[in-house]
Amino acid sequence: MHWTSILSAILLFCLSGARASPAKTVIRNKVPLLVTNACTRIFQKVTWEYTSKSKRSSPVCSYEPAFQSMLYCIYETLDEKGYSNKTLEKTFSTIKKNCASYSDALQNMTNSEFYDVLNNGTRHMTPYVKGSANLTYPVEMDTQLRKAYYHALHGFYANLDVGNIYGGIICAYFVAIMAFAGVLHCMNYTPFKTVLLKQKLVGYVRGYLTLPTIGSKHASDFSYFRIFTGYLPTRLEGIIILGYLVLHTVFLAYGYEYDPENIIFKSRRVQVARYVADRSGVLAFAHFPLIVLFAGRNNFLEYISGVKYTSFIMFHKWLGRMMFLDAMIHGSAYTSYTVANKTWATSKNRLYWQFGVAALCLAGTMVFFSFAVFRKYFYEAFLFLHIVLGAMFFYACWEHVVSLSGIEWIYTAIAIWIVDRIIRIIKASYFGFPKASLQLIGDDLIRLTVKKPARPWRAKPGQYVFVSFLHPLYFWQSHPFTVLDSVSKNGELVIILKEKKGVTRLVKKYVCRNGGKTSMRLAIEGPYGSSSPVNNYNNVLLLTGGTGLPGPIAHAIKLGKTSAAAGKQSVKLVIAVRGFDVLEAYKPELMCLENLNVQLHIYNTMEVPSLTPSDSLDISQQDEKADEKGTVVATTLEKSANPLGFDGVVFHCGRPNVKELLHEAAELSGSLSVVCCGPPIFVDKVRNETAKIVLDKSAKAIEYFEEYQCW
């Protein structure tokens, strides 16, 4: 078990012992509770001929005339509103709960005894005269006053309840979207998907709204002054996020029922501050389950919808930002409330207040260190801080509401976290902890091969696993890698590692110290992610480069073995690489394609072909040309050397012309699926060019599958 799981388990243990019995969230705006509390408040303010030695006392619970007056107030209010005796009897239970801390005498009272008290009080009931003091008899309150108290409490309680309802709707919004995505995902495995893609309206929607990036960036980050960096959603993700933001804004700003007479609160300002504080606080906590679910590896919505983990991380970020905004509004509004109510001096010393301040500070720190610049350059530090601060934030939030309400949102988030960790442990244990062979290839690549477990275990093309290298210096780290089935030895997995910062650099140093070839014990957890369903398309174009080769190569091998029988007209794999070291790492898999029904084109971007005057004049025979940004691209006439040693591959120098490749594929008869995984700029280029092709050929079934993942 990784150190993060251990830390979180300790946190859960602390939470379980934090308080003996956390306060449950109840629906407050129910008639029995509402009318009982309204009448209780009325008669708490009356001066009775009542004294008590106990500091905790209430005349409506302990002094019979006050108790009779409250019962009659409840009866009259319910009678005016047309409620039956059944509702009246529910108020008896509410009275018992309210008075449990003040009087034991009421706890064993039967409904008949409550009616006897009510009838006895009714016979002696006297209209209340304002200013009366030391009352020894039951009194009847003015109807307008009763209605005013009822309305005031109704607005206050409704605001608390509706916050939870709105939070539930936000959760349901994302679940509904993922359910709809799941329906579309299931259609990928039926002929209906290609029929749907041929509809012109669908093509226009996809070409303008769902496929393209916002601007020209999604996988690649935007940057201002090298400090303000980040990642933009796709247009579809942007639409979903916009819908969420609209919902959230409406839920935060709409539906308040203010009391014009300010019966409960001292002024309109105090009332508004309290209502906004309560609403924003409840909405903040409603984000807990989704934030934990979307960050988890075993997200059931990912399995249902087929939506990539990258998209869920995008939603996770926006949910986190809005949760922090809600918390800021909650803290500011509640501070304003206590200042205006002149209770700040005492409130700030309360435990819930102090933990609320701590939670807000922790949330702000988490948001700050989640900026893309920290994730990009200091990922391990970011991950460590995110987990530690997240655990502390959970604890602070628990303590903040443990005696109030809202704990159920934390319960749900903890349950999601526990299920995720249990599944992760099961997956890692199922694979076992085998020894893997590691071989250094070139300067920065490592080919890792490991035996599969004896029991059934299968990873589809494009799926990935999380690997922990069980070395004393970095066993606690877990990193994702796309996996391939070995073509040279049955029952083996292949993972290609490229040296970067962090654990891959340490692993490379370890391999180098052992002569470039060694073994190491691993923990493998997976597989995760979904495989792009390309089998139902007549033509498949696989575009890849950089470290994104495993998925498309695995697709090519699988399609090459089945394409003839499945009626595939064309399977084309286009690989862009900087030098041939990466080809050496994948040589067994690429050599396997020689005898398969796959067109393999490899572009060496380190070699730039030379232009001749005749090339530039004759467009039909030119070897390469510059795209709109001046990037040199190559065509089939300018060849590079063939390091693989077989004739089933066409080598080019320069960069692939994405637009041209897509147009060529789109001209083929039948449906087309485009699969892309590679460097961020390359992925964004393919996505946007595919969107243009979909618009140009809106009556043709063209689908785009992106296997690029951002962690």
UniProtKB/Swiss-Prot annotation:
Positions that bind heme 1: 316, 386
GO cellular component: fungal-type vacuole; plasma membrane
Residues annotated to bind heme 2: 330, 400
Keyword field: Cell membrane, Copper, Copper transport, Electron transport, FAD, Flavoprotein, Glycoprotein, Heme, Ion transport, Iron, Iron transport, Membrane, Metal-binding, NADP, Oxidoreductase, Signal, Transmembrane, Transmembrane helix, Transport
Single biological process term from Gene Ontology: nuclear-transcribed mRNA catabolic process, nonsense-mediated decay
InterPro entries in alphabetical order: FAD-bd_8, FAD-bd_FR_type, Fe3_Rdtase_TM_dom, Fe_red_NAD-bd_6, Ferric/Cupric_Reductase, FNR_nucleotide-bd, Riboflavin_synthase-like_b-brl
Residues in the Cytoplasmic compartment per record: 186-235, 302-317, 375-377, 424-711
Ferric oxidoreductase domain: residues covered: 280-414
Gene3D superfamilies: Nucleotide-binding domain of ferredoxin-NADP reductase (FNR) module, Translation factors
Record domain FAD-binding FR-type: where: 415-534
Enzyme Commission no: 1.16.1.9
Location, primary (coarse class): membrane
Glycan-bearing residues: 85, 108, 120, 134, 341
Stated name of the protein: Ferric/cupric reductase transmembrane component 2
Bilayer topology annotation: Multi-pass membrane protein
Tagged with keyword Cytoplasm: no
Organism: Saccharomyces cerevisiae (strain ATCC 204508 / S288c) (Baker's yeast)
Subcellular localization: Cell membrane
Catalytically driven reaction(s): 2 a Fe(II)-siderophore + NADP(+) + H(+) = 2 a Fe(III)-siderophore + NADPH
Functional description taken from the UniProt entry: Metalloreductase responsible for reducing extracellular iron and copper prior to import. Catalyzes the reductive uptake of Fe(3+)-salts and Fe(3+) bound to catecholate or hydroxamate siderophores. Fe(3+) is reduced to Fe(2+), which then dissociates from the siderophore and can be imported by the high-affinity Fe(2+) transport complex in the plasma membrane. Also participates in Cu(2+) reduction and Cu(+) uptake.
GO MF term set: ferric-chelate reductase (NADPH) activity; ferric-chelate reductase activity; metal ion binding
Transmembrane segments: 165-185, 236-256, 281-301, 318-340, 354-374, 378-398, 401-423
